[in-house]
Amino acid sequence: MRGFASSASRIATAAAASKSLNASTSVNPKLSKTLNSSGKPTNPLNQRYISQVIERKDWFLILNQEFTTHRIGLNTRFVISVLQNQDNPLHSLRFYLWVSNFDPVYAKDQSLKSVLGNALFRKGPLLLSMELLKEIRDSGYRISDELMCVLIGSWGRLGLAKYCNDVFAQISFLGMKPSTRLYNAVIDALVKSNSLDLAYLKFQQMRSDGCKPDRFTYNILIHGVCKKGVVDEAIRLVKQMEQEGNRPNVFTYTILIDGFLIAGRVDEALKQLEMMRVRKLNPNEATIRTFVHGIFRCLPPCKAFEVLVGFMEKDSNLQRVGYDAVLYCLSNNSMAKETGQFLRKIGERGYIPDSSTFNAAMSCLLKGHDLVETCRIFDGFVSRGVKPGFNGYLVLVQALLNAQRFSEGDRYLKQMGVDGLLSSVYSYNAVIDCLCKARRIENAAMFLTEMQDRGISPNLVTFNTFLSGYSVRGDVKKVHGVLEKLLVHGFKPDVITFSLIINCLCRAKEIKDAFDCFKEMLEWGIEPNEITYNILIRSCCSTGDTDRSVKLFAKMKENGLSPDLYAYNATIQSFCKMRKVKKAEELLKTMLRIGLKPDNFTYSTLIKALSESGRESEAREMFSSIERHGCVPDSYTKRLVEELDLRKSGLSRETVSAS
């Protein structure tokens, strides 16, 4: 491939010059600076400026001044963005304190409390130090009950059970009185921090503080005991809450269903669903997902499927979300046969899955279901309005091409175009790759022409994909043609490009040209990777050039690259041919040390070499270690050892066979 470097260099230089001319040389100074010389914000006020303000000790004064003077309006999205993007949780708290006092609407916004809670959890813990309490007092603000609930919630998620308890015991010093809301926050935090006993203690203290447990209190405790698998206690709590006039809701029953399934009590979980029906409580999406996933979690997959199908026959409450959950579980467990059965059954009921659920189900079917039947199911759902999407079509096309059902694969490729799914270089590249791997490169070339006719320019990945297809064939002429197109389009070859060209030359037995290309690669300043070296090492070994393969192996390790199994095997074989068995054994030890499992080729090569060098006992010892290192001996490896035993007894295989 001489001349490759010079022609590519000319095109690369021109491309670099073009990029330089098109580059922007100036930046809008108003956008690059957030503070002017006087420390005032640029207009409009931006998030970075706010972040700088709340780092200061006089943050509340500046915020009040800026938002009053400039009359800059706040909106929920902006507030959320500021809260989320602070590295210090104290800054998130400061901004929330200010904004919730500046406009009472934000104090009632549940989404802001959730965002603040997440920020305090991710960056925290933020503890109530004396300095922080003084700062809040000096700012003229106070910690409200709602804010205290957010803080307690973050501590609970961080596992600070004792701290939650200690702070709650001293809330009177913060000007607060115990309330059911605060008790609920503490009990929830204690449950989340795995301190159920302490949560029960707080539950028992509520009434002495004049706070009556409500439905939230009971649901929190029921959730805690169900997580532990103590479902009988959960049932007792449900009875107690009913006696106090707190009727269980959908969340209560969802928690109970999950608890019974965690405990493996499927029948009891089904009874809870029946109880919901009797009480005219409709299961929500969380209930149904909990039920389906719980059934699959506590029963063997086939039994779980049987239970759910039986439930579906009796009760129509499974709904669409239930069908989605069942399909997800079937796909996740690679149950192709059951997935096909379920799709047919729910399809008859008019169920139409969304694209992601359908694609997951199709991927499962393609791994183990009859391909013709899979296509029939696919076509049936598409005719009813399902939109499989690009990936849904592509996995089916790949399966058909692998099965050499080319006409059917082409039909779906055509439909992808009709549905407008081929609209970018990325989608075309995926189709071209699919066709190249199926050895249908001529068809792939048609898609290249089509994409260019539509004004979609190929990229380097496109050309590398074609190089990969022709490289496997060892078609040097075609590879050269693709390379010329790649350069004409102004692309600089990368390590993948060079490796594919080298692989093609090696497959065509043009080893000298392969090493010339390797040299040009280095001249271009492109560092070879493991794949490049492994290709050359294997090729040298296959042509008997053992010296060069050993040198490449050493160079590869010198550059910090890890040879693969095939490179190790090829080098071990080279050493054995050179009668340097000790070096070959050292490589085997290296493989085991770095966690690379030798295969039967590795062991048979060494066993044969040890045997031929008169080291029969070591050959047998190596054979006995094969299974210990995670490899099952094949028939050839076993035969080598059998011949050793026969030789030792003075017999030949032919003599044994004749007798």
From Swiss-Prot:
Signal peptide: none annotated. It is found in: Mitochondrion. Keywords: Mitochondrion, Repeat, Transit peptide. Residues 1-32 form a transit peptide. Coiled coil: none annotated. One of its GO terms (cellular component) is mitochondrion. GO terms for biological process: mitochondrial ATP synthesis coupled electron transport; response to abscisic acid; response to oxidative stress; response to salt stress. It comes from the Eukaryota. PPR repeats lie at residues 109-143, 144-178, 179-213, 214-248, 249-283, 284-318, 319-353, 354-388, 389-423, 424-458, 459-493, 494-528, 529-563, 564-598, 599-633. It holds the Pfam family PPR_2. Belongs to the PPR family. P subfamily. Required for the ubiquinol-cytochrome c oxidoreductase activity of mitochondrial complex III. PANTHER family: MEMBRANE-ASSOCIATED SALT-INDUCIBLE PROTEIN-LIKE, OS03G0201400 PROTEIN. This is Putative pentatricopeptide repeat-containing protein At3g16890, mitochondrial.
